[in-house]
């Protein structure tokens, strides 16, 4: 399958929590997680989820830190190479507020905003209680997230927003 949409996330599972609906609705995604490439459990969970939604994927090995940043010079260089790989119809990443303030989500968003042109979109959630994803997409996101067994303790915190993408 030809991929023409790019999703760049800080951590494996971010794509499912914040962008799972898009991955389920549209084909042709390439998903990059910039952290946890040397963690065999996280790498395998990510690959399994990406295979389940038929997304091309890659996982890099920048350090995963709660109150951390990235080596932005190296990250920009590596991301530019990926961006130049093809003409992307849509590029999606974290919002500048980092969804819930995660410093690495914010840092990645800042880098992406610096190097991506007009077709950059960020994860967002409806604040209207009546606006939710269709039930089948919520089920799909839950199925995706159920593969991240190492992250159950974190995913539990996001139940309230899973339907609001």
Regions found by a protein language model. Give the residues of each.
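Metal-dependent de-N-acetylase/amidase catalytic core
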Residues: 1-8, 69-165
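Active-site rim/loop-helix segments in enzyme catalytic domains that contact anionic ligands
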Residues: 1-87, 113-117
């Amino acid at each position: 399958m030809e991929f023409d949409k790019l999703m760049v996330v800080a951590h494996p599972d971010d794509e499912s929590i914040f962008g799972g609906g898009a991955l389920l609705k549209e084909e042709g995604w390439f998903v990059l997680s910039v952290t946890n490439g040397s963690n065999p459990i996280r790498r395998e969970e990510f690959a399994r989820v990406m295979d389940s939604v038929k997304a091309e994927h890659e996982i890099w090995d920048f350090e995963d830190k709660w109150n951390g940043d990235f080596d932005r010079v190296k990250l920009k260089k590596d991301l530019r190479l990926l961006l130049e790989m093809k003409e992307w119809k849509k590029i999606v990443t974290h919002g500048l507020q980092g969804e819930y303030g995660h410093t690495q989500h914010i840092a990645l968003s800042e880098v992406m905003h610096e190097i991506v042109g007009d077709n950059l979109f960020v994860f967002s959630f409806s604040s209207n209680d009546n606006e939710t994803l269709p039930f089948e997409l919520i089920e799909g996101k839950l199925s995706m997230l159920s593969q991240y067994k190492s992250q159950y303790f974190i995913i539990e915190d996001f139940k309230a927003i899973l339907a609001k993408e």
